[in-house]
């Protein structure tokens, strides 16, 4: 019997089973123990293959692919700490709902806890963060192929959102020519190999029922809070709220067009909060809210009912309101709960939103971080997409900009870390093949710098704007100790990104005014290549501008 040949047949069943559940993208890191999985993926024509030398970046690349494709994405890595590097992406997927299938090669049981090289305790290493876990046995013909394929099918049928970790031990030898070993074992699956359906099909219904009293609540004074959702859902939510006459507070990731812009500014005004207190019901569609003032209002508002609708299961209301948690796709829920045409009941909030917007517009000519956030909609590529980083930049865009309704916006706002942002943006671009604008801070770019390797070959123009404010300036918004702030919080690195771009043969610009930025962008959108644009700004100007605007709007 050839161990290497049977390893490959075992792996081929696993990979083929994944295709029956919509997996098309497979992300592969180099490794020896993962050879059976890698070769099975490489030989399966149903897959689009992506490779990267860094497993942490690979996991985030898969995350970006899953965000856009809305399908599960497989990741193949070798044993040892390679597996541990998938942890950040796995955690993010668990919080934002993207489906990742993590195929982690492992040493066989007899090599664990005995001093063998590159052998760690992988089974269960991700604790409660995967939505599903599956620890497979060592490949053996004593276990029928139908057990293996039905086990994979069952795990994927149970995967509503988040990650499935499949740990796959393989014994040596890992290399060798294919022979007839295990061929009969494999052929017992019959015409399944020519079919396109899972071996085991399980129906799982998660959608909430229609709320029978909706006809009553839609006649009340309501507020719509829009969190993370798709572009198509964002447009529908905006129209739904407008018909109801309810104010819509749209997050930067809502893609609703934010009809009441600068919510993070006007929610700091007591008049707005007083008017919102009249709401009898709040309907929150989508999770992962960004704005600090929005979260503060959400934590203190006390409507008669607070409904949260999202496709992800679990509790998504950190303020623990009395109300309803409804699991459903947002578009489906809106269809089941149509709006009734009513006059808007809010008067003060639209006025405050307009005044706040005027205050922001008055400062747009200054070359700076806050002004870039406000102007970002002017720089979006036609029929393209936006990827927004974390920390200060996403808060500035949320507070100061008004993105077009239905324009695709992506971000990692689950755990909201700054790790893997460039890799995620690369996955977003690869899955869509659209022109992409990504904007991150300097520390975020440094954190994921080797992801520039993923941006060397792109299918459409990709612009990466690095806002270099020399450190983690979000801490300037927090009451961190002044004497300790620079060394222990901001951590300025005093670097520029021209050499990093050159290392990966990427185009690079460092504009010093809006005209130079617009010229660089105009050239970038004409070529299917990556352009790095570094905006060097005064360290604390972005945070200070936001604080000044908050103070101004609070006194309107």
Curated annotation (Swiss-Prot):
Keywords: Magnesium, Manganese, Menaquinone biosynthesis, Metal-binding, Thiamine pyrophosphate, Transferase
Textual note on the cofactor: Binds 1 thiamine pyrophosphate per subunit.
Broad class of enzyme this protein falls into: transferase
Catalysed reactions, semicolon-separated: isochorismate + 2-oxoglutarate + H(+) = 5-enolpyruvoyl-6-hydroxy-2-succinyl-cyclohex-3-ene-1-carboxylate + CO2
Cofactor: Mg(2+); Mn(2+); thiamine diphosphate
This enzyme's EC code(s): 2.2.1.9
Gene Ontology MF terms: 2-succinyl-5-enolpyruvyl-6-hydroxy-3-cyclohexene-1-carboxylic-acid synthase activity; magnesium ion binding; manganese ion binding; thiamine pyrophosphate binding
Biological process annotations from GO: menaquinone biosynthetic process
Pathway: Quinol/quinone metabolism; 1,4-dihydroxy-2-naphthoate biosynthesis; 1,4-dihydroxy-2-naphthoate from chorismate: step 2/7; Quinol/quinone metabolism; menaquinone biosynthesis
Gene3D superfamilies for the chain: 3.40.50.970, TPP-binding domain
InterPro entries attached to this UniProt entry: MenaQ_synth_MenD, MenD_middle, THDP-binding, Thiamin_PyroP_enz_TPP-bd_dom, TPP_enzyme_TPP-bd
Assembly with partners or alone: Homodimer.
Family from the record: Belongs to the TPP enzyme family. MenD subfamily.
General function of this protein: Catalyzes the thiamine diphosphate-dependent decarboxylation of 2-oxoglutarate and the subsequent addition of the resulting succinic semialdehyde-thiamine pyrophosphate anion to isochorismate to yield 2-succinyl-5-enolpyruvyl-6-hydroxy-3-cyclohexene-1-carboxylate (SEPHCHC).
Protein name per UniProt: 2-succinyl-5-enolpyruvyl-6-hydroxy-3-cyclohexene-1-carboxylate synthase
Native organism: Salmonella dublin (strain CT_02021853)
């Amino acid at each position: 019997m050839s161990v290497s040949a049977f390893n490959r047949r075992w792996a081929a069943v696993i990979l083929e089973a994944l295709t029956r559940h919509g997996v098309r993208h497979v992300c592969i890191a180099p490794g020896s123990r993962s050879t059976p999985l890698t070769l099975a993926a490489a030989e399966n024509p149903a897959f689009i293959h992506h490779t990267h030398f860094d497993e942490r970046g690979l996991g985030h690349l898969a995350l970006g692919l899953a965000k856009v494709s809305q399908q599960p994405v497989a990741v193949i890595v070798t044993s040892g700490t390679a597996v541990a590097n998938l942890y950040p992406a796995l955690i993010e997927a668990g919080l934002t709902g993207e489906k990742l299938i993590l195929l982690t090669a492992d040493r066989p049981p007899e090599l664990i806890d005995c001093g063998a090289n590159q052998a760690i305790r992988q089974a269960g290493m991700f604790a409660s963060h995967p939505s599903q876990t599956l620890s497979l046995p060592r490949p053996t013909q004593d276990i029928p192929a139908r057990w293996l394929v039905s086990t994979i099918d069952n795990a994927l049928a149970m995967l509503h959102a988040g990650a499935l970790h499949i740990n796959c031990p393989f014994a040596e030898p890992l290399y060798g020519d294919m022979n007839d070993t295990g061929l009969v074992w494999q052929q017992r699956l019959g015409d399944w190999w020519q079919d396109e359906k899972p071996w085991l099909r399980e129906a799982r219904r998660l959608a909430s029922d229609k709320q029978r009293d909706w006809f009553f609540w839609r006649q009340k004074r309501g507020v719509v809070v829009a969190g993370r959702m798709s572009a198509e859902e964002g447009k529908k939510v905006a129209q739904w709220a407008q018909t109801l006459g309810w104010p819509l507070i749209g997050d930067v990731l809502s893609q609703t067009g934010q009809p009441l812009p600068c919510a993070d500014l006007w929610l700091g005004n007591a008049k707005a909060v007083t008017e919102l207190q009249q709401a009898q019901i709040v309907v929150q569609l989508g999770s992962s809210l960004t704005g600090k003032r929005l979260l503060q209002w959400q934590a203190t508002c006390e409507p008669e009912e607070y409904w949260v609708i999202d496709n992800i299961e679990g509790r998504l209301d950190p303020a623990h309101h009395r109300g309803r948690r409804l699991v459903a796709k947002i578009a489906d829920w809106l269809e089941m709960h149509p709006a009734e045409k009513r006059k808007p009941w809010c008067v003060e909030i639209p006025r405050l939103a307009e005044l706040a917007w005027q205050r922001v517009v008055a400062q747009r000519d200054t070359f700076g971080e806050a002004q870039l956030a406000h102007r970002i909609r002017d720089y979006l590529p036609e029929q393209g997409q936006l990827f927004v980083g974390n920390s200060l930049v996403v808060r500035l865009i949320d507070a100061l900009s008004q993105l077009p309704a239905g324009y695709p916006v992506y971000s990692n706002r689950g755990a909201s870390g700054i790790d893997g942002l460039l890799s995620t943006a690369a996955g977003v671009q690869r899955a869509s093949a659209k022109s992409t604008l990504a904007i991150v801070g300097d520390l975020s770019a440094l954190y994921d710098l080797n992801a520039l390797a993923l941006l060397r070959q792109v299918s459409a123009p990709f612009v990466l704007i690095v806002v270099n404010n020399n450190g983690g300036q979000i801490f300037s918004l927090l009451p961190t100790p002044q004497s300790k702030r620079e060394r222990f919080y901001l951590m300025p690195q005093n670097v520029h990104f021209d050499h990093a771009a050159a290392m990966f043969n990427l185009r690079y610009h460092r504009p010093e005014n809006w005209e130079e930025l617009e010229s660089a962008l105009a050239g970038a959108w004409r070529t299917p290549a990556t352009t790095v644009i570094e905006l060097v700004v005064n360290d604390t100007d972005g945070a200070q501008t936001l604080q000044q605007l908050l103070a101004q709007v609070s006194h309107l």
